[in-house]
């Protein structure tokens, strides 16, 4: 999530001509769409999940209109069960791949990474690797190709004596 926010912020800064936090950056003017910081609303009688779906629908409408947009989706479809989330996410990924659209999609669902095999020219798995050394997590903060193999949630839960 932090990395996605950094990319989104740098896009906005670059588009207004401000300095960015990067060694180099090349972009073309795009509208930025995200599902980050989506909120529910009791006043609108709108659940988090429905608010997220409305945002995704707005993205698809813009793509269908032929607009150039950059999409950032963070853990999409959080408001449903894991099977429905995976199926819906994969279908959305397939639909998005029909358009000329740059997107960053973050997920912790390892099955979603199979989309790279299905769409090898349009989907690329990237991750931040973590090592466990001397009972500590070591972060290298380097974007790597592939799917992370470190299971840090269980490690941290055990370390904090949660499980």
What spans do the regions from the language model cover?
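ATPase nucleotide-binding head domains, primarily ABC-like/P-loop NTPase cores
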Residues: 1-163
């Amino acid at each position: 999530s932090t990395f996605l926010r950094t990319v989104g912020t740098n896009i906005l800064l670059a588009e207004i001509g401000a300095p960015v936090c990067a060694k180099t950056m090349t972009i073309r003017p795009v509208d930025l769409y995200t599902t980050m910081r989506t909120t529910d609303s009791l006043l609108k009688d709108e659940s988090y999940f429905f608010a997220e779906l409305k945002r995704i629908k707005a993205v698809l409408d813009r793509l269908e209109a032929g607009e150039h947009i950059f999409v950032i989706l963070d853990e999409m479809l959080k408001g449903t069960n894991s099977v429905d989330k995976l199926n819906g996410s994969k279908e959305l990924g397939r639909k998005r791949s029909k358009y000329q659209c740059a997107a960053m999609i973050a997920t912790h669902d390892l099955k979603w990474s199979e989309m790279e095999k299905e769409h090898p020219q349009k989907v690329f798995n990237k991750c931040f690797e973590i090592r466990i050394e001397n009972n500590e997590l070591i972060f290298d903060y380097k974007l790597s190709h592939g799917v992370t193999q470190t299971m840090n949630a269980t490690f941290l839960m055990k370390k904090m004596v949660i499980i």
